[in-house]
Amino acid sequence: MKFFLIAAHIFFLTAQNAFSQNFDKGFAAYMLGNYSQAIIEWRHKASSGSATAMSNLGNMYEVGAGVEQDKVLAHQWYNLAASNGDVVARKNKQDLEENMTMSQISNALILAKKCMISGYSDCD
């Protein structure tokens, strides 16, 4: 039993380390201005359910860093991040909605639902 607990703990630490390394790669790429690489890294983490990565993707789409500026996709990512507990994303989504039409918001909600149903694999 003790061996199992130690193995489980090592697995948890390894998985946690791998998770943070990928996130750090995204942040490092962003800080270097390599936005397309940051998006690749954060999309990978978002597909695993990372609210922070989802929020970062929302920001990228909102400002058009490395992607074409797109309020609908920004809202989608902020909504997904907020649904996963990111309070900053919730605020960003509310602020963004002030500059969106009802049709855009509706489309963003449809996309977010589709993304969630797909297990975060069909999100763009």
Per-range role (PLM):
Residues 31-35, 47-48, 61-69, 83, ...:
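Short coil/turn and helix-start
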Residues 4-14:
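Sec-dependent N-terminal signal peptides
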